[in-house]
C-alpha cells in the first residue's frame, strides 16, 4: 500500500492508500438481496493485504497483493503500479480480480485513505452540489463546486454511508492556505470525503455515538453500487451493481500548494 505522499517535507496522508470494496451499510443495503449481507458474508468489511511480489524499475513500482478477509480467505488479487513523474504527480494504476467463489457482490471498487481534518476545503468537477449515486443522480448538475466534509455528510438518525458524488473529473482537498491533494482520473469517477471513519460509521447506532478523531475519510471509486429502494421497494437494479469481473482503473494524485 502507498504509505506516504509528501509536499515539502509535509506528510499529506494520515493512513495508507488501500483498496476498498465495502461501504457502511445504508438502510436499503441491509434489506437488499445483493447488499450488506453478501458483503459481510465475504468479509469485505475487514480486509488486509498480503504482498505476493514486488518489482521496481527506474520509473515505477509494481506490487501484486492478495486481498484477504478476517478469516484469511482470499477475496481477490490486486496489482498496483505506482509511477512518479518529475513534477511530483503520482499515478496509481490498479487492477483487481475478485474471487467469485467468495465474493458474490461488492459495494464499491476503489481506493480509500484518511487525511488530517485541516484539509477541509473541497472542490470538484462533477455532479453536485447534492449527494448523488449512480442510480439517483439526474438532479445533480455537472459543474465546479466548493464544499466541506461537514456539508457533504448527512446526519441520518441511524448513521450510514452518505456524501457520495458521481461523474467526477477531478477533486481537490486543501487546507486554508491552499495546500493539499489534487486527484484526477482518465475516466469519470465517484468520491466522498466525510468527517468520520468507516469503522465508526458502521458501528454507531445513533447520531450521538459519532465521535470525531481529527481525520477525514476519503473514497475514490471507479465503481460504486447504487442505493436502490429496498426498504420500501425494489433493490438495486442489475445495471447499477458493481460488476464481478477483472477491472482496471487509475488515479493520479498531485501534491498542490
Summary of predicted features, one role per range:
Residues 1-257:
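Beta-strand/loop-rich accessory regions of lumenal/periplasmic or secreted enzymes
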Amino acid at each position: 500500500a502507498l504509505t506516504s505522499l509528501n509536499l515539502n517535507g509535509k506528510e499529506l496522508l494520515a493512513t495508507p492508500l488501500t483498496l476498498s470494496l465495502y461501504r457502511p451499510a445504508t438502510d436499503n443495503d441491509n434489506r437488499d438481496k445483493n447488499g450488506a449481507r453478501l458483503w459481510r458474508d465475504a468479509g469485505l468489511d475487514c480486509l488486509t493485504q498480503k504482498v505476493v511480489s514486488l518489482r521496481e524499475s527506474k520509473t515505477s513500482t509494481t506490487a501484486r497483493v492478495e486481498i484477504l478477509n478476517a478469516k484469511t480467505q482470499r477475496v481477490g488479487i490486486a496489482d498496483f503500479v505506482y509511477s512518479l513523474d518529475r513534477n511530483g504527480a503520482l499515478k496509481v494504476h490498479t487492477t483487481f480480480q475478485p474471487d467469485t467463489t467468495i465474493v458474490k457482490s461488492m459495494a464499491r471498487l476503489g481506493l480509500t485513505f484518511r487525511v488530517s481534518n485541516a484539509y477541509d476545503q473541497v472542490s470538484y468537477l462533477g455532479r453536485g452540489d447534492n449527494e448523488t449515486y449512480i442510480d439517483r443522480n439526474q438532479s445533480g448538475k455537472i459543474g465546479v463546486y466548493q464544499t466541506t466534509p461537514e456539508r457533504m455528510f448527512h446526519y441520518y438518525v441511524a448513521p450510514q454511508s452518505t456524501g457520495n458524488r458521481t461523474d467526477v473529473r477531478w477533486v481537490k482537498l486543501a487546507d486554508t492556505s491552499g495546500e493539499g491533494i489534487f486527484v484526477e482520473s482518465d475516466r469519470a469517477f465517484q468520491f466522498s470525503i466525510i468527517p468520520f471513519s468507516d469503522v465508526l460509521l458502521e458501528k454507531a447506532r445513533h447520531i450521538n455515538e459519532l465521535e470525531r478523531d481529527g481525520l477525514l475519510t476519503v473514497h475514490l471509486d471507479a465503481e460504486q453500487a447504487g442505493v436502490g429502494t429496498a426498504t420500501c421497494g425494489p433493490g438495486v437494479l442489475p445495471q447499477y451493481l458493481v460488476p464481478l469481473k477483472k477491472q482496471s482503473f487509475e488515479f493520479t494524485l498531485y501534491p498542490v500548494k
